[in-house]
Amino acid sequence: MLLAYTISIFHLTILSSISGIRREWIGMNLIPFQTIRSYINLYLEGELHNASVNIIGNIVVFIPLGCLLVLLDPKILFKKIFVIGFLFSFVIEILQLLLSIMKILSRSFDVDDLFLNTVGVLIGYLLVSGVRFLVKLIHKTIFLKTPLEKSKEVRK
């Protein structure tokens, strides 16, 4: 499942942008929150689609990675999820940068993408961890009561 997800992300972020046309290098953004601010301004000016797709899309696309990592290793730590998510996103951004410099892609390296993608991974981690916690709590509450607790319920 993780391999299929990785291939899908690679296709979405790299392969879908490759064409036979030589492209100009777009550049890079190394200033944190600059792109996010510009998308928020677009949103405020009524450009809902572009702003939403870019901000929400960068987050949502990486939620499955956080989910999959927790499912593969239920004891994985938040810090490790953060590092894996950041590095996964960093590799994609570096590939986009290198392929853009070689005029194969017209994508850019954007530090805000690293932030948004990592947030997506962390949301996936928190979702699965939260659901697991609730399932355990419900299971414990319903099925693992002591005989004394069960007898008290019967008397009520």
Task: Identify the residue ranges that each predicted region occupies.
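Bulky hydrophobic segments
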Residues: M1-R107, L122-K156
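Membrane-interface transmembrane-helix boundary segments in multi-pass integral membrane proteins
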Residues: D110-V121
